[in-house]
Regions:
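Function-determining sites in protein domains
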Residues: 3-167
Length: 167
């Protein structure tokens, strides 16, 4: 009987230890906040700033039918845009998309007759997505790229456009 009691105590102790280990693992994996460090990435344009003839900027708040366009032709403004995008810190992670995003797009028209589009969708404060079909990327950014629309050159005229013109 003494041996049986000893075995029962050992068995119970082992089972309790296993249960505590399972609880600890579960807590570590599922209940503690997981902080994944995403490596920052940069845009690598397949062209140089000197190759850009002009940049068409498009913007709408939530509804594409309300889109407007500005055309950037001044070399300084083109260089400013180019450099801002080259210097952005982007992350290769998904964003939580919501309907009615504010969208600001940029079409870099190049001297060889081609163009390169960047589309920025803002889903909330410091929560945006920058994508390019030609560049083959879709990155998260906390940068306020939408502010380029208002702040680049306040003298640029915004004209209403048809939704079909959007990148």
């Amino acid at each position: 009987k003494e041996k049986q009691r000893g075995r029962k105590k050992i068995t119970i102790a082992v089972l309790v230890s296993i249960a505590l280990c399972i609880i600890a693992i579960f807590t570590a994996l599922f209940l503690l906040p997981i902080n994944i460090a995403y490596e920052p990435v940069k845009i690598d344009f397949p062209f140089e700033v000197e190759d850009v003839e002009n940049v068409e900027m498009y913007h709408y708040d939530g509804v594409p039918a309300s889109a407007e366009k500005k055309v950037v032709v001044a070399e300084n403004d083109i260089k400013t845009l180019y450099d801002k995008f080259k210097g952005l810190s982007l992350k290769d992670k998904t964003t939580e998309e919501t309907a009615g995003a504010d969208v600001t797009s940029f079409r870099f028209n190049l001297s060889d007759g081609t163009s390169y589009d960047l589309i920025y969708a803002c889903y909330g404060v410091k929560n945006g997505e920058l994508k390019s079909e030609a560049g083959g990327f879709k990155y998260f950014t906390s940068a306020d790229i939408g502010s380029y629309w208002n702040n680049l050159n306040t003298e640029l005229e915004a004209i209403p456009i048809n939704e079909s013109e959007l990148p």
